[in-house]
Swiss-Prot record:
One of its GO terms (cellular component) is basal plasma membrane. The gene is SLC22A6. PANTHER family: SOLUTE CARRIER FAMILY 22 MEMBER. One of its GO terms (biological process) is organic anion transport. Residues 1-23, 157-164, 217-224, 270-337, 390-395, 447-456, 506-549 are cytoplasmic. Glycosylated. Glycosylation is necessary for proper targeting of the transporter to the plasma membrane. The chain crosses the membrane at residues 24-44, 136-156, 165-185, 196-216, 225-245, 249-269, 338-358, 369-389, 396-416, 426-446, 457-477, 485-505. Secondary active transporter that functions as a Na(+)-independent organic anion (OA)/dicarboxylate antiporter where the uptake of one molecule of OA into the cell is coupled with an efflux of one molecule of intracellular dicarboxylate such as 2-oxoglutarate or glutarate. Mediates the uptake of OA across the basolateral side of proximal tubule epithelial cells, thereby contributing to the renal elimination of endogenous OA from the systemic circulation into the urine. The keyword Cytoplasm does not apply. Keywords: Cell membrane, Glycoprotein, Membrane, Transmembrane, Transmembrane helix. CDD domains: MFS_SLC22A6_OAT1_like (cd17446). InterPro entries: MFS_dom (IPR020846), MFS_sugar_transport-like (IPR005828), MFS_trans_sf (IPR036259), Orgcat_transp/SVOP (IPR004749). This is Solute carrier family 22 member 6. Multiple cysteine residues are necessary for proper targeting to the plasma membrane.
Length: 549
C-alpha cells in the first residue's frame, strides 16, 4: 500500500485536509499584494520643478515663467529656467516659452497628489536623475525572493515544511512592518529585500505542504484553488490601494496580518510524507493518526501500527534516509533533465509575466482599473487551465499557456500605439495565459520531483523565476532603441521555452515519486505497480536458484 492509499484509508479529503489547505493558502491573498505592491507605493505622479522659494505659486503666471515646455507644450519634469521668462508663450506649444538657460531642479519638485497622495517617489524624490532608484527597490525585492527560494527550499527538505513556513510568516510580518516605518530609502530597500526572501519561502512551502497531504486525484484542484486565491489578492490590492493611498499605511496593511498567520501556523501538521522520506517513522505514524482522528477515522488510525506502516512505506523508509542536496539536480541524469527543462519554463513564465504586470502606468488608463482587469482575467484563464490540467494533462496545459502568451505579446509588438484597446486586450490575454502557466508549473514541478528533493527542486525553479523577474525590467530599457523591442523579447522567450515541455513526463493520475529510482522508472515508462509485480515474479526464481545450489 503506497502513501496515497494510506491517505484514502484515513479519510482522503477529510476535515483535516479542508481546514489545513484553507489556512495554508489564506496568506497567499496578501502575498500577491507584496509582489506587485510597488505599482502603487512607488507610483510616479505628474511632477515639475519647484521654483525658488520667493515665487508666488498662487499666481499661474509666476509659476509658468519658471517652467520650460517640451515638444508637446507640457511643462518639463526635470528642468527649470535659471531666471523667470516673462515673454509670451509660443504658438501650439512647439517651443519653450523662453530662451533662457535651464538647470536640473535645484529646489526639488512639486507633485500632483490628486491620485497618489504619498508614495516612496514623492517622499524621497525618486524622479529625474534618481528615477532608477525606484526600479532598484523592486529589483532588490526580487533579489530577496531569489535568495529566499534558494535558501528556504533547501531548508524545508532538511528541517521540514512546517518549521520553515512558520519562520517565513514571522519574517514577512516583521520586515514588511519595518518597511512601513522605514526612515530613509536605504532602510526601506533593506526591509523589502528581507520581505522578498520570506515571501518566496511562503509560496514554496504552502504549495508543497498542501500537495503532500492530498490524494492524487485532488492535487489539480489544490493547485488551481491556490492560483485563484492569488488572483483574489490582485483584486484586493486594487481596492486596498484605492482606499488607502498613503504608501506607509498600505505597506502596513499588507504586512501586519502575517502576525496572525504566524500565530495560527503553529497548529499546522507537518507532512507525514516528508517524515517518512526522512526515515522518522514514529513521527510519520503520530501525524497520520492525528489526521485520522480529525477526519473521524479513529478506528482506522488506531489500527495503523508501526509494523503496518513499515510494510506500506518500505521503499520510502529504505531509500529516503539520506538527504539529497541541490547538487543532485545536476549530478543525477534523470533529475538533471527535469531541472534544465523546468528551469527554462520557470524563467520564461516569470520573465514575461513581470514584463507586463510591473508597467501598469504604461497603459495610459487608470492604474486601479488595469489592476482589477489583470486580476479578473485570471478567473476564466485558470478555469480553462484547470480543465485542461485535470482532463487532458499537465503537459498540454503548460505548452498551450506559454505559446498563447508569447503569441499575444508578439502580436502586441506590431499593433500601432494608437490602437490602445487592441493593445490592452492583447496584454490582458497574454497576462491571463502567463497566470495559467504559473498555476500549472507550481503543480507540475511538485509532481515530477521525488519527495527527497521536491522542495529543493521547487526552490531552484522559483530561483530561476526570480532571475527572470530581475532581468525583465532591464529588458524594458531596450525601448530606447525601438518601442516594440521589449515586447518582441517578452514574447519570443516563452515561445522558445515551450519546446522544453516535450522532454518532460506527463503526471496526470500518477503517484508522486518518492525516490530518484521512481523518476527513472517513470522516464522508462514503468509504473510503481509494474515494479512491484516484477519483484514478485523474481521471488520464486530466486528461491528456485537457492534450491538448485
Amino acid at each position: 500500500m503506497a502513501f496515497n492509499d494510506l491517505l484514502l484509508q484515513l479519510g482522503g479529503v477529510g476535515r483535516f485536509q479542508k481546514i489545513q489547505v484553507t489556512l495554508v493558502i489564506l496568506p497567499l491573498i496578501l502575498l500577491a499584494s507584496h509582489n506587485t505592491l510597488q505599482n502603487f507605493t512607488a507610483a510616479i505622479p505628474t511632477h515639475h520643478c519647484r521654483p525658488p522659494a520667493d515665487t508666488n505659486l498662487s499666481e499661474d503666471g509666476d509659476l509658468e515663467a519658471w517652467l520650460p515646455r517640451d515638444g508637446q507644450g507640457r511643462p518639463e519634469s526635470c528642468l527649470l529656467f535659471t531666471s523667470p521668462q516673462r515673454g509670451p508663450p509660443f504658438p501650439n506649444g512647439t517651443e519653450t516659452n523662453g530662451t533662457g538657460a535651464t538647470e536640473p531642479c535645484p529646489h526639488g519638485w512639486i507633485y500632483d497628489n490628486s491620485t497618489f497622495p504619498s508614495t516612496i517617489v514623492t517622499e524621497w524624490d525618486l524622479v529625474c536623475s534618481h528615477r532608477a532608484l525606484r526600479q532598484l527597490a523592486q529589483s532588490l525585492y526580487m533579489m530577496g525572493v531569489l535568495l529566499g527560494a534558494m535558501t528556504f527550499g533547501c531548508l524545508a527538505d532538511r528541517l521540514g515544511r512546517r518549521k520553515v513556513l512558520i519562520f517565513n510568516y514571522l519574517q514577512t510580518a516583521v520586515s514588511g512592518t519595518c518597511a512601513a516605518f522605514a526612515p530613509n530609502f536605504p532602510a526601506y530597500c533593506a526591509f523589502r529585500f528581507l520581505s522578498g526572501m520570506s515571501t518566496a519561502g511562503v509560496v514554496l512551502n504552502c504549495m508543497t505542504l498542501n500537495v503532500e497531504w492530498m490524494p492524487i486525484h485532488t492535487r489539480a484542484y489544490v493547485g488551481t484553488l491556490t492560483g485563484y486565491v492569488y488572483s483574489l489578492g490582485q483584486f484586493l490590492l486594487a481596492g486596498m490601494a484605492y482606499a488607502v493611498p498613503h504608501w506607509r499605511y498600505l505597506q502596513l496593511l499588507v504586512s501586519a496580518p502575517f502576525f496572525a498567520f504566524f500565530i495560527y501556523s503553529w497548529f499546522f501538521i507537518e507532512s507525514a510524507r516528508w517524515y517518512a522520506s526522512s526515515g522518522r517513522l514514529d513521527l510519520t505514524l503520530r501525524n497520520l493518526q492525528r489526521v485520522a482522528w480529525i477526519n473521524g477515522k479513529q478506528e482506522e488510525g488506531a489500527n495503523l501500527s508501526m509494523e503496518a506502516l513499515q510494510a506500506s512505506l518500505k521503499k520510502e523508509l529504505t531509500t529516503g534516509k539520506s538527504q539529497a542536496s541541490a547538487l543532485e539536480l545536476i549530478r543525477c541524469p534523470a533529475l538533471r533533465r527535469l531541472f534544465l527543462c523546468l528551469s527554462m519554463l520557470w524563467f520564461a513564465t516569470s520573465f514575461a509575466y513581470y514584463g507586463l504586470v510591473m508597467d501598469l502606468q504604461g497603459f495610459g488608463v487608470s492604474i486601479y482599473l488595469i489592476q482589477v482587469i489583470f486580476g479578473a482575467v485570471d478567473l476564466p484563464a485558470k478555469l480553462v487551465s484547470f480543465l485542461v490540467i485535470n482532463n487532458v494533462g499537465r503537459r498540454p496545459a503548460q505548452m498551450a499557456s506559454l505559446l498563447l502568451a508569447g503569441i499575444c505579446i508578439l502580436i502586441n509588438g506590431v499593433v500601432p500605439k494608437d490602437k490602445s484597446i487592441v493593445r490592452t486586450s492583447l496584454a490582458v490575454l497574454g497576462k491571463g495565459c502567463l497566470a495559467s502557466s504559473f498555476n500549472c508549473i507550481f503543480l507540475y514541478t511538485g509532481e515530477v520531483y521525488p519527495t527527497m528533493i521536491r522542495q529543493t527542486g521547487l526552490g531552484m525553479g522559483s530561483t530561476l523565476a526570480r532571475v527572470g523577474s530581475i532581468v525583465s525590467p532591464l529588458v524594458s530599457m531596450t525601448a530606447e532603441l525601438y518601442p516594440s523591442v521589449p515586447l518582441f523579447i517578452y514574447g519570443a522567450v516563452p515561445v522558445a521555452a515551450s519546446a522544453a515541455i516535450a522532454l518532460l513526463p506527463e503526471t496526470l493520475g500518477q503517484p508522486l515519486p518518492d525516490t530518484v529510482q521512481d523518476v527513472e522508472n517513470r522516464r522508462r515508462g514503468k509504473t510503481r505497480k509494474q515494479q512491484e509485480e516484477l519483484q514478485k515474479q523474481m521471488v520464486p526464481l530466486q528461491a528456485s536458484a537457492q534450491v538448485k545450489n
